Structures are given as structure tokens and as C-alpha cells.
Amino acid sequence: MNIVYKVALLAITIAFVSCEQCEPVTIESCSNAGYTLTARFPDVDGRPYQDVHKYRLKIYIPLLETCSSFSSTILCSLYVPKCEEGRAKPWIPCRKVCSKFVAECVGTLRVAGLLGLFTTLCDLLPDENPQSAKNCFYPSNFNDPTSGG
């Protein structure tokens, strides 16, 4: 239940964070996430935001990286979403990326008790379409056979 609370809190935080100023992603576990800049979040109890969350990612990413090459992208985007200077809001992965991650990791997510959480998370992410194409991103290694990309 703790992770459900944190994901909900994080979604609210991201909604109010601006990417007017980005900072480098310093969490080593996120080095394969497909981006290097994240939004500048406020400190948590006087500690840098990324320092607070790096330990959680250090646990979850190794658990899931063996089942999907998109594990880092999905998990890191929850805590340190992609940022681009001058862009109003952080970027999040498109729904197809999350759905592919869940499909590839369904067994591991089920055993960890996280399948429902990530299935719901994927449903909340934007589809790529003319209205939302600039609200989500695909990692460079994403190949979607249904779209040819």
C-alpha cells in the first residue's frame, strides 16, 4: 500500500512541478532510463529530492530490469520524470511504453504484488495522438510494431 500512496503523491507533485529549470538525473539506477535531465523538485525534509528516492529505485530497478528494457524508463519516470528546458511540464512515457513494460514483466509484477498498480498506472498515461503527442515520449529503443516505430 505504501507504493500506491507514493505514486499518488508523486502524480500530484508532478502536476505542479515546472520544467522551466531542469537538473541532471543523479540517480545511478536511472542511467539507462533514456534521458539525462529531470525537473527540479523541492527538497524533502531538507534533503535533496533525488537523494531521498534513489534507494527505492535501487531496489525496484534491479528486480524488474531483467524482464523489460523499459523498466528504468517507467520506474525512473515515476520519481525523476524527463525534463526539457523551457518546457512547461515534465514528460512522462507514452501508454504503449508502459503497457509493453507490464506485458514483459507480468509474472514478476504479479509475484511482487504490483501488477494491478502498474496496469492502472499505464491506463492513466497519455496515448500518442495529435492532442497528446507532446505530452509523452518514447525511449529511443522503443519499437512498436503496430505503428511502425
Specify the residue positions occupied by each region the protein language model found.
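Cleavable N-terminal signal peptides of Sec/SRP-targeted secreted and luminal proteins
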Residues: 3-19
